[in-house]
Amino acid sequence: MVKLAIDMMGGDNAPDIVLEAVQKAVEDFKDLEIILFGDEKKYKLNHERIEFRHCSEKIEMEDEPVRAIKRKKDSSMVKMAEAVKSGEADGCVSAGNTGALMSAGLFIVGRIKGVARPALVVTLPTIDGKGFVFLDVGANADAKPEHLLQYAQLGDIYAQKIRGIDNPKISLLNIGTEPAKGNSLTKKSYELLNQDHSLNFVGNIEAKTLMDGDTDVVVTDGYTGNMVLKNLEGTAKSIGKMLKDTIMSSTKNKLAGAILKKDLAEFAKKMDYSEYGGSVLLGLEGTVVKAHGSSNAKAFYSAIRQAKIAGEQNIVQTMKETVGESNE
């Protein structure tokens, strides 16, 4: 049995989409228990495997992250994180304030001893539909080569345990594929990655080939990773708008659009990384999953499923044994 703590109040469409996703999750997974934190006036579910706990406060999207965690002690996000810290829950899921959730993860759930800096990981789509693991996408703007090596180790575990990939191929994001390319960070990181024979390091990868499906894990610093992620999001939205404008521009195009409607919907689904679940803060004493702030019920359900798999696979213990101090 896996038990998850869930923030009912976080996100643009909460609590309705959270309640819908939670209801579907407990119906689909008979080995799942949920502790739901939020406003009792908005709680509508009744299920033997859902425990509800009232919280008098909510962390807003515009709240300053660290201040909110410290001051809003009775918020749904803080109480959710405390349930993971105490061992009452195996992991947690929230679509709320990203900075606040990362702060809750670091200051409440706690970092695994031996992990220098936790990393935010997301699974992004590829042309062939299999996707790739990408980290760090914003937990740490600055990084040292040693941090990127640990990110690779964490990403390797994630790809194996969560995505079911044996001996995942690991690449370093760079401005060229040659070993000597890049700045001091990428050059030194390349050396460290190449020396770690526990990893299947296949070399550098350029941003233009990220979605080709040639690798399973891509490692970079949080500043670069966040920019790449937002660029991909923006590009996908722009392409979608351009396609829509083109289809609606003439009767001929409208007819073609009607014929291709199903195919276009499938294409949009393949490009939507929320299909793979949320982003995960790796390197903590518990699983912390961040669903997209604008998640619908389906995307939040995927994030719940992702946290459940992490609990089943005991990913935190594996990280402790492989990357943490217990490995030393």
Curated annotation (Swiss-Prot):
The keyword Heme does not apply. Pfam families: FA_synthesis (PF02504). It comes from the Bacteria. InterPro entries: FA_synthesis, Phospholipid_synth_PlsX-like. It is found in: Cytoplasm. GO terms for molecular function: phosphate:acyl-[acyl carrier protein] acyltransferase activity. The gene is plsX. Pathway: Lipid metabolism; phospholipid metabolism. Catalyzes the reversible formation of acyl-phosphate (acyl-PO(4)) from acyl-[acyl-carrier-protein] (acyl-ACP). This enzyme utilizes acyl-ACP as fatty acyl donor, but not acyl-CoA. Keywords: Cytoplasm, Lipid biosynthesis, Lipid metabolism, Phospholipid biosynthesis, Phospholipid metabolism, Transferase. It catalyses: a fatty acyl-[ACP] + phosphate = an acyl phosphate + holo-[ACP]. Homodimer. Probably interacts with PlsY. The keyword Lipid biosynthesis applies. Belongs to the PlsX family. One of its GO terms (cellular component) is cytoplasm. Its EC number is 2.3.1.274. PANTHER family: FATTY ACID/PHOSPHOLIPID SYNTHESIS PROTEIN PLSX, PHOSPHATE ACYLTRANSFERASE. This is Phosphate acyltransferase. Its main location: cytoplasm.
